[in-house]
A protein has these predicted regions:
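Low-complexity, glycine/alanine/valine/leucine- and proline-rich hydrophobic stretches
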Residues: 401-425
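Active-site segment of extracytoplasmic enzymes that catalyze sulfate/phosphate-ester chemistry
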Residues: 37-39, 44-127, 136-137, 149-163
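Bacterial N-terminal signal peptides
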Residues: 9-22
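Bacterial Sec-dependent signal peptides at the C-terminal "C-region" and cleavage site
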Residues: 20-31
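Polar, surface-exposed loop/tail segments
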Residues: 57-58, 87, 121, 130, ...
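Loop/turn elements at helix/coil->beta-strand transitions in domains of secreted/extracellular proteins
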Residues: 31-35, 66-71, 120-126, 145-148, ...
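Active-site-proximal cap/lid insertion segments
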Residues: 30-33, 42-55, 155-179, 188-348, ...
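N-terminal secretory signal peptides that target proteins for export/translocation
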Residues: 1-8
Length: 510
């Protein structure tokens, strides 16, 4: 879809003023929207007020009512490092190669990321918050040079503002980092306006990632409350699932969601309320600077979170709670009739970059996996794809998987055949069973659907073989994930990568 621009008649009336001010750049800046991308950490799709009234998110709710909310938004890899690189580049994990146990991001991929390309095209750019990855062979500080303003932090960053150098000066007023990032953003907006350029700002909050330590002013809103468990809550609601999933850290750790659900939910939701408050602060700053009417806001999260569904904590797994997160796109230039709509189209984290490029009118790199979502703003009932792959290339071999999701079905193949496990298929009728309570893979009534999803799976596996990046350990997956090659003919997993092996990443690593 073409980029929306100022009507020609109005633009003609502004030309004299532009010429007097020295013109062409100002006209281009006015025609191109400003773009803000806000990114939470570990926020599952139902953890906003419009999905769950127990979560206090008035600003997110308002953003959705004034924009378009996407209810089938998937994280192509449901873990932070890979997801963040997919957001920046528009590439699936096996194409950019960055994840735990697979390696750091190569510079050539960062140089084709949306912030770098928009800056090259004349945008004033800024980044604050958790980066979540390193550049291969380079110091972390190198990343700052790709932006006009920088307040990014290595590792997990901290909830305590004073411990994050890029925002430490805001600690006295905003001791918790979520609101401090909004204060930094307000100063960025002032500088961006003074630059005379359109801007692209990306903020990556730590919240609501573990450890659950919310701002006290948000925590008190949830103190002592009892929260509704999801329909698929608890270990008993996961007995029907593959034994492979039970070998992942989502099953073996994170027991707070089983042992102390209300306390965990209170802290988790309070952290999200803090991010919501930051969104409100940023929108107030946009209004003060006179930038609100030409600034697009996108909001999402790097992955979902299980919250005790099927007895799981954490993320990583391909089930709905871990693999889906919110996506809201707010374009103030949308006509009133197009606001407040809900799109059920399949979207993914790889689509963020393509969408930002389309808003900015800056061509996206050729061959990326993402697709622009701008057509869905005008037609939320439309589609940009028919199926979406979900990858887990990380962690114990027994819990790694490839899944395919369509608007109605999800197919998961658990390939591991060692450690007492057998390769297993799961098929869920998402239209009738959104909580994934019945695996219908062996039900002959669904044989046609199973065969179609197998076909899509095999095609995706062939694409992995054809497009994977070299040197990051993905060459084994076309064989390991094959449905047709017997387990006994596949290469043995590396030492320490099985369910009985040593886990390489702990609770706080990602």
């Amino acid at each position: 879809m073409p980029l929306r621009v100022i009507p020609a008649a109005r633009l003609l009336t502004l030309i004299p003023a532009f010429l007097a001010a020295g013109a062409v750049e100002a006209a281009a800046a006015t025609a191109r929207p400003n773009i803000i991308f806000l990114f939470s950490d570990d926020q599952t799709a139902r953890a906003i007020g419009l999905e769950n009234p127990e979560v206090i998110t008035p600003n997110l709710d308002r953003l959705a009512r004034e924009g378009v909310r996407f209810t089938h938004h998937y994280n192509n890899t449901a873990i932070c490092m890979a997801s963040r690189c997919s957001v920046l580049t528009g590439l699936f994990e096996h194409r950019h190669g960055c994840n735990f146990e697979h390696g750091d991001l190569q510079r050539r991929f960062l140089e084709q990321s949306y912030p770098v390309l928009l800056r090259r095209a004349g945008y004033y750019t800024g980044f604050a918050g958790k980066v979540g990855f390193d550049l291969k062979g380079e110091k972390f500080e190198t990343l700052a040079g790709f932006f006009d303003q920088w307040a990014g932090g290595p590792g997990q960053t901290f909830y305590e503002t004073e411990k994050n150098p890029g925002i430490a000066k805001y600690a006295a007023r905003y001791p918790h980092s979520s609101r401090a990032y909004a204060a930094w953003a307000a100063d960025f907006l002032t500088a961006a306006k003074a630059s005379g350029k359109p801007f692209c700002l990306s903020i990556s909050f730590k919240a609501p990632h573990l450890p659950f330590t919310p701002d006290p002013q948000d925590a008190k809103l949830y103190a002592g409350k009892t929260f509704t468990r999801p329909p698929n809550y608890g270990v008993e609601k996961g007995r029907h699932l593959s034994a492979h999933a039970r070998t992942s850290r989502a099953a073996t750790g994170y027991r707070e969601w089983i042992n102390a659900y209300d306390e965990s939910a209170a802290a988790y939701y309070a952290l999200i309320t803090g991010v919501d408050a930051a969104l409100g602060m940023i929108r107030e700053a946009l209004a003060r600077e006179g930038l609100a009417e030409n600034t697009v806001i996108l909001y999402s999260s790097d992955n979902g979170y299980n919250m005790g569904a099927h007895g799981f904590g954490d993320k990583v797994l391909p089930y709905e709670e871990a693999s889906k997160s919110p996506l809201i796109i707010h374009d103030p230039r949308l006509p009133a009739a197009s606001r407040g709509r809900i799109s059920t189209a399949l979207t993914g984290q790889v689509d963020i970059a393509a969408t930002v490029h389309a808003f900015a009118g800056v061509p996206a790199p050729g061959g990326i996996d993402g697709r622009s979502l701008l057509p869905l703003l005008d037609d939320p009932a439309g589609r940009v794809r028919e199926a979406m792959p979900l990858f887990n290339y990380w962690g114990v071999s027994s819990a790694q998987s490839l899944a395919i999701v369509t608007p109605s079905w999800k197919y998961i193949f658990w390939a591991h055949g060692g450690d007492g496990l057998r390769p297993t298929e799961e098929l869920f009728d998402l239209a009738k069973d959104p909580h994934e309570m019945v695996n219908v893979a062996s039900d002959p009534r669904h044989a046609a659907a199973l065969n179609e999803m197998r076909r899509r799976y095999d095609a995706e596996l062939a694409a992995i073989a054809a497009t994977r990046v070299e040197g990051h350990g993905y060459e084994k997956y076309p064989v390991l994930f094959s449905r047709t090659i017997p387990w006994t003919e596949k290469p043995a997993p590396e030492k320490g990568s099985t369910a009985k092996g040593k886990r390489k990443a702990g609770r706080e690593e990602n």
